């Protein structure tokens, strides 16, 4: 129902799913294993414990009364996030348009991702070690991104291709912007984007080398009738 759609809307990446899972675990009285270790608190029967690894996976434990040598019951689930990943050093300008170079993850249908609103989620770690959480494109006041496609009257040859070839992986670069710095003749759009990133989001282009950014749909879940 509504709570499931809310989880999907707020959990478009592994990190975001883990954040929500930790919040739910705490509400259910689970405690962080790392905190128990720091405080030298012994684990006892009845304890409810969670552990996260690199902020991208989570394990929850209900401690029983039997010895662990007798085994344990395991219930596993997979956090799957269909997405397109931003490469390191991704930014380039072509024909007065700025793009970010990408590579796609796993089993996506590439033609699903063109000419639709997209958002950028992830983490940027600056050269001084500062960590910035990024979520651009999900709110109405945010800029919107897209992967370009051919117009219908220019795509007749394209439409004859097999579905796996209609959109090639190399064509999945993200359009970031087209507005140049005024009176700049060379890479004016790049300069505008760089100024915007620093002013609005607190990082510069070189910080993308140590970033983990993912392209996800900029839409919310809706109920089917």
Question: Which residue ranges define each predicted feature?
Answer:
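N-terminal hydrophobic/helix-forming segments and targeting peptides
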Residues: 1-222
């Amino acid at each position: 129902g509504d709570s499931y759609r809310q989880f999907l809307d707020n959990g478009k990446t592994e990190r975001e799913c883990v954040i929500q899972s930790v919040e739910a675990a705490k509400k259910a009285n689970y405690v962080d294993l790392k905190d128990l270790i720091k405080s030298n608190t012994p684990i006892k029967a009845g304890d409810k414990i969670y552990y996260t690894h690199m902020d991208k996976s989570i394990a929850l434990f209900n401690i029983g009364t039997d010895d662990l040598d007798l085994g344990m019951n395991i219930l596993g689930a997979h956090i799957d996030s269909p997405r397109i990943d931003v490469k390191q050093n991704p930014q380039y300008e072509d024909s007065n348009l700025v793009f970010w170079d990408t590579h796609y993850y796993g089993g996506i249908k590439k033609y699903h991702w063109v000419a639709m609103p997209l958002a950028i989620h992830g983490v940027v770690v600056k050269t001084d070690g500062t960590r910035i959480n990024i979520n651009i494109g999900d709110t109405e006041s945010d800029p919107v991104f897209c992967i370009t496609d051919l117009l219908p009257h220019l795509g007749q040859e394209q439409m004859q291709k097999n579905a796996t070839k209609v959109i090639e992986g190399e064509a999945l670069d993200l359009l970031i912007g087209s507005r140049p710095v005024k009176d700049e003749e060379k890479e004016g759009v790049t300069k505008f984007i760089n100024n915007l990133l620093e002013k609005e989001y607190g990082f510069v282009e070189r910080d993308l080398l140590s970033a983990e950014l993912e392209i996800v749909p900029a839409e919310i879940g809706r109920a089917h009738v």
